[in-house]
């Protein structure tokens, strides 16, 4: 019999219950007990949703981030959060976001609260984790209480499950040494704590534990490979069965290593690396389980179940009970339930599968393998019809778009003149001071904005009323910025629910859901649009709003667009053609918008590429091809404008030291980046690379409610000036201010502008 299991389930709830519960708690509108009760309610619901599985995940739920959970399980807390009042949950949120719900945190430091933990991308996904912090003297101590609580809850519900934990080597690999120490030097201190955790689970009668080591799909040097051997040799003596889980790609040159580790089972990503399975069957010892990720855990298209069975059936005959099947990775990266999508186009809806539907697909596969295809003939026939419908649909293919792609040539991505010739023309047109100030684009999405949007979508507010409401919010943003004396303004994006979905709603070839939310970090959720067909722009998307905002002020107003690579990487993308082709289609559509903004008199146009880096393949050997088409797509989008039009781009959550040459090749006049959480460490790239254009290193962390001081910002900018000539520096926040409140934004920007004025006085 084939065993079914799942690596992880979305934790936010089908209606984002966790998001709203967290935000109520942080605002002091609910108690700690109420938040914990909500967590228990969601876990119970999700385990019930997974009852048909042979083994459901336990411990995959988190109030913020699973890596942060592991840090607390291992007793690895930053010293700056120690000594505060409150319980473990308070300290947990202090690390995650700089403060808890405790009022005492308001005055803990000069900024209020403490410095939040650094946040970065989880491998090549749009999920973000809190980076573990290490020092040479870091010690670990086990606190399994959270995991044991979830285990007890699952057992009380009669759930057959397996605890899920992050592996010791991946945990170290994901972290950052805050001194010059070697993270791997901590492995001898870390392994006994992991051993104690496994012993604790054994004492609880746990048979299987899932240990995630996704670094096995990355390029590892000899030291990290040896660390994996050392770790699992040390843990082998425990009396618990270990399923070692890998995902997000092929094992590649780590295949033999993974197959040889002394564990009881190995899970592999059979979506991205199906061709490795035969080799694993040969190399795995005869007593080991092989779990294949046969359902795509990162995308929302239905699985071709008949084709998958054609592949799985010989494997099941060969392996028998040693074969397990599961999604390729945790379902954290897909929405919860397609059944909620009653307004989605029925044809497109028939092509999709969210988390619950993927579990249904898994059960169909298992039934077919264990009892024969006849037992699920109706389900297989319905699946085949949906797959064929999508393949044949004329809505997927647009000959005009394909013809436009064929006309792309090398010249399309080139500016008329190099930056050195453009910069004086832009300076003359814009007349900006030294250390010019700006923001990244969005301002707070207030309750009034959200209410107006809901009323407009429901029909309770007509188009004229909605336009008037949005114009009022835009005017408020402009007046606030003028009062703050910012130099280059933005319209605030009141009309946009999301920086990607907003454009997806207006492009042919896209569909959008009502409840297709996935977690980005903490309480932050995104609703990726669905890129199902060839992309084109029927009409202008932003010109009306930007020109209205510009009419309110004499200061430069930035046109705000999301770039093609970010739209691609933050969408659920069709899987029937190369991603590069879809990206070029997006580039042509956004290019038309750039040119329309310029024709309307917009002098500064920002094209956000926040997700450029996250699209990088996990293996460096594959980076070149991706960067070639990603950079080319940006250049096609941006480079049709005149020399005196200033092009900005923005990148957030990105470590870009290793791709700085490609970023320079994008040839944006100004790049703004996230740097504050890393204390300007991201600028280390400029020690060895002379970045030719202008740059705005983010000077305060918008993901934390803490207010930066003027002196703190001045200090950060002085660090930046050690690497970038002062005449090419801008002063700006890390990212957009959509998720903050005006009461936080105004004092933070006041201090930022004051810091810029101080810097100007110091360089005169």
Curated annotation (Swiss-Prot):
Active site location: 703
Enzyme class, spelled out: transferase
Cofactor binding, note field: Binds 1 zinc ion per subunit.
CDD domains per UniProt: CIMS_C_terminal_like, CIMS_N_terminal_like
Residue stretches spanning the membrane: none
Pathway given in the UniProt record: Amino-acid biosynthesis; L-methionine biosynthesis via de novo pathway; L-methionine from L-homocysteine (MetE route): step 1/1
Annotated residues for binding of L-homocysteine: 440-442, 493, 608
The protein's Enzyme Commission number: 2.1.1.14
Binding site for Zn(2+): 650, 652, 674, 735
Binding site for L-methionine: 440-442, 493, 608
Catalytic activity: 5-methyltetrahydropteroyltri-L-glutamate + L-homocysteine = tetrahydropteroyltri-L-glutamate + L-methionine
Keyword Amino-acid biosynthesis appears in the UniProt entry: yes
Source superkingdom: Bacteria
Keywords carried by this UniProt record: Amino-acid biosynthesis, Metal-binding, Methionine biosynthesis, Methyltransferase, Repeat, Transferase, Zinc
Gene Ontology MF term list: 5-methyltetrahydropteroyltriglutamate-homocysteine S-methyltransferase activity; zinc ion binding
Required cofactor(s): Zn(2+)
Function summary: Catalyzes the transfer of a methyl group from 5-methyltetrahydrofolate to homocysteine resulting in methionine formation.
The family this protein is said to belong to: Belongs to the vitamin-B12 independent methionine synthase family.
Protein name: 5-methyltetrahydropteroyltriglutamate--homocysteine methyltransferase
Gene: metE
